[in-house]
Regions:
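Alpha-helical residues within the helix-turn-helix
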Residues: 12, 23, 52
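Short alpha-helical DNA-recognition segment
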Residues: 16-33
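A short, Lys/Arg-rich alpha-helix, primarily the initiator
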Residues: 1-13
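Short, basic-rich loop-to-helix N-cap that marks the start of a DNA-contacting helix
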Residues: 39-49, 67
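Short, charged recognition helix plus adjacent turn
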Residues: 52, 60-70
């Protein structure tokens, strides 16, 4: 299974820049870049902070892809 986030999707949906989201959740922009590219797994606190910004449930930020399905 591959773990992916929908952070970029939600961010772009509201017209927010990476640096703006980073400021709202108190991290560097590079962290947002890594999250969106699947190179960093967020802490529970960061996940909750991001979900709060978009007014969504934490579960809505993630999806799982089964890489073994043909």
């Amino acid at each position: 299974m591959k773990f992916t986030t929908k952070i970029k999707e939600y961010r772009e949906k509201v017209g927010m820049k990476q640096f703006e989201l980073a400021e709202l959740v108190n991290v560097r922009r590079e962290i947002i870049v890594c999250l969106e590219n699947g190179k960093y797994n967020p802490s529970l606190k960061l996940t909750m902070d991001i979900a709060k910004v978009f007014d969504i449930q934490v579960e809505e930020l993630f999806s799982f892809i089964d890489e073994n399905v043909e």
